[in-house]
């Protein structure tokens, strides 16, 4: 029976490309349902969304139309009316919710006809992604469950466990530290990734205090979850409150990412499309068993044309109607690459900045067609622009997921340096481009990072565990790709187990386990960790070389550096105007590391991180136990100048008053342009600024100097004028002076060592 759905004949006959669902206008509502195997279809209209209420208003017979669709119209303003479909297949009639319902009543049984624009928040028409135009590698993604943010009393958020909890500002702990939205904004992340917020199963929305669930149990894909709304009974409320939440995020400079679960449904037999077209939505074997690569009881047959259309339509709807800025796909590897590419293409037609990423684990599934390619990690080249979570960096840093007490790099395990280097460079073994690699050390699955460290280093003091946590964060936050962190990681989130230990699968554990414990921020050690995360994020944002988008750029700019210690890795990263030197030491002892020649500014060390310079060092540095040390320096801009002699005097110039270091004296010259030799640059500059031709002779000396606004390498040449008389075309004044007269003029700081050398070598005049 099910094989026919994947046949070419069935797809050619019944693939429909138009709009489906209920389309409201003040004058009438038009309905269209895809039900190619149905013998009869009707619409039931209800006064309320309560499935137990006896409030039927009317029943309308639908008429068969093109490509297996059924249509009907109802004149009059139906805004706020609820509806279902009665579908008869093979003599059995079922009442089902519209797969394209935009909202529902309580528990998602009855769809609701809604004037969607009527619930838009103010300025919704001008609402936009605050990070539009940026690369996904510029993102820092923060994974958050709607309920976790606000359910703890210490959050002091009024709308606990609700969409509106994410709109509240000014909330603080008793100690005065920001909570909720203010905390997220201050952290510096760019994208808030919300765990599933469409209508999901398991949770009874009618309860005053609904059961907790992560939400990976899809029921109505295009409907917001009612348990997160202040009123789950009236379908307009959940729609309005999601829009208010997204608007609040955008107004605070945060993009919104939606976690979507198209790879399986909560109950395959009860799912609306499988009720309307029995078995069509799912992969079912010839013996009638559901494929179960998802380990959730069923797998979605995305390779079928109308399943693919449904998924594409659904994602586009959330991007269009709710202004979602990104989508994270749960077990994307069960969805075929054609569908993934069609989703991205369709969304990007209107919203070119929307980001896409997901899980690419290789899961077994029973495909309904031959030759289908799935969106697994190793097929990243087939889905350009789609990112995948890197389980490699996760397991190397914290220990393999399949052995709960096995330590990782940060807890002192000896791991492959080559593997760590590959992680830092964005996993070239499977990520076609670095922007397809999502780096993380914790997410909602498994234990939190701090809990995992406690399991793998049970005898380590708390201070050492915090160091391990921070080392992991520094490594993944500075790696090429897209950094991703679980909400609360920045304040050492923990999930205590019911009978001791830790909860490693809290998908339906109570708020007491899952909520963010804001009160911990009133303790200094937690504030220190939070400050460290803020500094890491700020540092990443400040350095474009940590956010490269192409494999060629990574190969050109990122260079592993040999470290003898087996617990230490280091990297040198080239920037357009500077360099970064990063050392990650997981040893319990300090490690000495030789720096490349020159002076380096320390930006990250021990428990401190940021963009400010802590100190300037050179030569060899000592990297503290279990810590990262990151140093930077700006590349010197090549500057050339002339020691232009006329008998026993040389020429000096006074800088214009309106320029940096205005009215200070200097030697004539300027910046070297691309393709020029130093003598050529000096000759050009002196012609432009002095109107003279130079005979450039031997080099006198070279110095480096760091100004607040520029780092220069200045090379000085002996010269004489071969043609012309110097004119102050760009300078304030010119002077010919004896070497012994330099103390009568205030020179630019970069010239200090040059003046000393002139005085030492010549002391008096120097005729040429």
Regions inferred by a protein language model and the residue ranges of each:
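Substrate-binding/active-site clefts of carbohydrate-active enzymes
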Residues: 147-322, 332, 340-351, 355, ...
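Active-site-adjacent beta-strand/loop module that shapes the phosphate/pyrophosphate-binding cleft
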Residues: 635-638, 693-695, 702-725, 733-741, ...
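Conserved alpha/beta catalytic core and glycan-binding cleft of carbohydrate-active enzymes
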Residues: 114, 344-500, 507-509, 558, ...
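Carbohydrate-binding surface patches
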Residues: 25-39, 538, 558-596
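Glycan-recognition and catalytic regions of carbohydrate-active enzymes
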Residues: 481, 485-498, 515, 519-580
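The feature marks proteins involved in alpha-glucan
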Residues: 1-26, 30, 52, 56, ...
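C-terminal beta-strand-rich structural cap/linker in extracellular carbohydrate-active enzymes
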Residues: 35, 79-81, 614-634
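Conserved N-terminal beta-strand and adjoining loop/helix that marks the start
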Residues: 635-650, 671
């Amino acid at each position: 029976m099910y094989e026919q759905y994947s046949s070419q004949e069935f797809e050619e006959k019944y693939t429909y490309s138009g709009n489906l669902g209920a389309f409201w206008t003040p004058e009438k509502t038009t309905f269209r349902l895809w039900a190619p195997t149905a013998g009869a279809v009707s619409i039931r209209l209800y006064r309320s969304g309560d499935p137990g209420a006896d409030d039927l208003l009317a029943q309308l017979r639908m008429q068969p139309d093109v490509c297996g669709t059924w249509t009907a119209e109802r004149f009059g303003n139906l805004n706020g009316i609820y509806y279902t479909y009665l579908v008869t297949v093979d003599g059995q009639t079922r009442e089902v919710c519209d797969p394209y319902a935009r909202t529902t009543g309580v528990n998602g049984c009855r769809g609701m006809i809604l004037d969607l624009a009527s619930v838009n928040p103010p300025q919704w028409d001008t609402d936009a992604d605050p990070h539009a135009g940026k690369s996904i590698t510029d993102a820092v993604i923060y994974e958050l469950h709607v309920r976790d943010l606000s359910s703890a009393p210490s959050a002091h958020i009024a709308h606990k466990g609700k969409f509106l909890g994410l709109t509240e500002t000014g909330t603080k702990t008793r100690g005065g530290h920001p909570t909720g939205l203010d905390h997220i904004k201050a952290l510096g992340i760019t994208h808030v990734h919300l765990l599933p917020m469409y209508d999901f199963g398991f949770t009874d929305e009618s309860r005053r205090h609904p059961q907790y669930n992560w939400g990976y149990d899809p029921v109505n894909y295009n409907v917001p979850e009612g348990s997160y709304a202040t009123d789950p009974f009236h379908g307009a409320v959940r729609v309005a409150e999601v829009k208010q939440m997204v608007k609040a995020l955008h107004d605070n400079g945060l993009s919104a990412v939606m976690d979507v679960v198209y790879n399986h449904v909560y109950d395959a037999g009860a799912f609306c499309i499988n009720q309307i077209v029995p078995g069509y939505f799912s992969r079912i074997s010839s013996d009638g068993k559901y494929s179960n690569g998802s380990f959730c009881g069923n797998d979605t047959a995305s390779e079928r044309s109308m399943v693919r259309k449904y998924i594409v339509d659904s994602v586009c709807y959330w991007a269009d109607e709710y202004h979602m800025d990104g989508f994270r796909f749960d077990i994307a590897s069960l969805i075929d690459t054609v569908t993934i590419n069609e989703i991205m293409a369709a969304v990007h037609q209107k919203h070119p900045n929307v980001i896409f990423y997901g899980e690419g684990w290789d899961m077994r599934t029973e495909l309904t067609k031959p030759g289908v390619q799935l969106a697994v990690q190793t097929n990243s080249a087939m889905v350009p622009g789609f990112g995948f979570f890197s389980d490699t960096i996760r397991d190397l840093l914290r220990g393999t997921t399949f052995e709960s007490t096995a330590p990782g790099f940060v807890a002192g395990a000896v791991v492959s340096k080559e593997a760590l280097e590959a992680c830092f460079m964005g996993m070239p073994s499977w990520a076609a481009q670095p922007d397809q690699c999502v780096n993380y050390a914790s997410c909602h699955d498994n234990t939190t990072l701090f809990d995992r460290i406690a399991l793998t280093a049970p005898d380590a003091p708390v201070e050492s565990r915090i160091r391990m946590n921070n080392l992991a964060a520094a490594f993944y936050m500075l790696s090429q790709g897209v950094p991703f962190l679980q909400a609360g990681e920045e304040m050492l989130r923990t999930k205590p187990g019911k009978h001791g230990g830790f909860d490693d699968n809290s998908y339906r554990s109570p708020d007491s386990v899952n909520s963010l414990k804001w009160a911990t921020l009133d303790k200094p050690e937690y504030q220190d960790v939070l400050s460290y995360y803020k500094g890491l994020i700020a540092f990443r944002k400040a350095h474009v070389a940590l956010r490269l988008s192409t494999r060629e750029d990574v190969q050109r700019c990122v260079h592993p550096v040999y470290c003898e210690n087996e617990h230490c890795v280091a990297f040198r990263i080239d920037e357009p105007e500077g360099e970064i030197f990063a050392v990650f030491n997981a040893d319990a002892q300090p490690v000495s590391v030789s720096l490349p020649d020159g002076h380096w500014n320390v930006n990250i060390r021990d428990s401190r991180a940021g963009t400010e310079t802590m100190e300037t060092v050179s030569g060899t540095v000592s990297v503290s136990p279990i810590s990262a040390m990151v140093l930077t320096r700006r590349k010197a801009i090549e500057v050339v100048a002339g020691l232009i002699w006329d008998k026993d005097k040389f020429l000096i110039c006074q800088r214009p008053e309106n320029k940096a270091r205005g009215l200070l004296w200097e030697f004539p010259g300027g910046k070297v342009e691309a393709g020029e030799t130093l003598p050529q640059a000096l000759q050009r500059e002196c012609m432009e600024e002095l109107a003279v031709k130079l005979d450039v002779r031997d080099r006198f000396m070279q110095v480096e100097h760091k100004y607040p606004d520029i780092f220069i390498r200045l090379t000085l040449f002996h010269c004489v004028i071969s043609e012309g008389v110097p004119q102050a075309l760009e300078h304030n004044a010119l002077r010919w002076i004896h070497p012994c007269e330099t103390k009568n003029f205030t020179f630019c700081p970069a010239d200090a060592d040059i003046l000393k050398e002139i005085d030492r070598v010549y002391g008096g005049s120097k005729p040429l």
